[in-house]
């Protein structure tokens, strides 16, 4: 009947890390397709149900990797590009949908104890703790007018 909150949490990372190793361009397009365009497509599909909802929150698991302002990485180009594209796309949707009562949230969960990024023993958080912190962020009362990228540690990441 209705959907009040949509959480985009799908994400993949590519296998080629360094430009000197030769990029896998079809793989890069796949990463962009899943990480950025996937959220746009799912949002579009759910809008009729969300229009009838009350909270109208669209929440995205993003990453500090999508921050141009704080970029420190030397590799993982496709992942970084895909998260920057997700953030930019959601900024446009936020501008468009705000007048219809929607709120969009971007969230960086930190390095989670999963196999997505390799050696999971060194990660900051386990998936359960990361999910708890994400939900806290999504339900937190927000006073900012602009869309921001919240981090698991309570900071706001410039992007």
Where in the sequence are the language-model features?
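Structural signature of the Rossmann-like NAD(P)-dependent dehydrogenase/reductase core
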Residues: 8-9, 57-63, 103-108
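Catalytic loop of short-chain dehydrogenase/reductase
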Residues: 12-32, 40, 51-98
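Ser/Thr-centric signal marking residues that sit
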Residues: 43, 82, 114
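Local beta-strand N-terminus motif with an aromatic residue
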Residues: 2-3, 28
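Short-chain dehydrogenase/reductase
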Residues: 43, 90, 131
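Conserved hydrophobic beta-strands of the Rossmann-like cofactor-binding core
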Residues: 3-7, 11
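C-terminal helical subdomain
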Residues: 106-114, 118-159
């Amino acid at each position: 009947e209705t959907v009040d909150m949509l959480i985009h949490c799908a994400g993949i990372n590519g296998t080629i890390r360094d430009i000197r190793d030769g990029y896998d361009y079809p793989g890069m397009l796949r990463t962009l397709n899943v990480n950025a365009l996937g959220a746009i497509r799912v949002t579009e599909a759910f809008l009729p149900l969300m229009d009838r909802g009350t909270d109208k929150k669209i929440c995205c698991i993003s990453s500090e990797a999508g921050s141009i302002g704080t970029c420190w990485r030397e590799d993982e180009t496709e992942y970084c590009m895909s998260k920057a594209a997700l953030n930019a796309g959601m900024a446009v949707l936020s501008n468009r949908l705000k007048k219809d009562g929607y709120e969009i949230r971007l969230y960086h969960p930190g390095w989670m104890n999963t196999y997505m990024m390799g050696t999971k023993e060194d990660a900051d958080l386990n998936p359960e703790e990361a999910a708890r912190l994400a939900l806290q962020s999504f339900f937190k009362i927000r006073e900012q007018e602009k869309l921001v990228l919240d981090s698991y540690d309570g900071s706001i990441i410039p992007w």
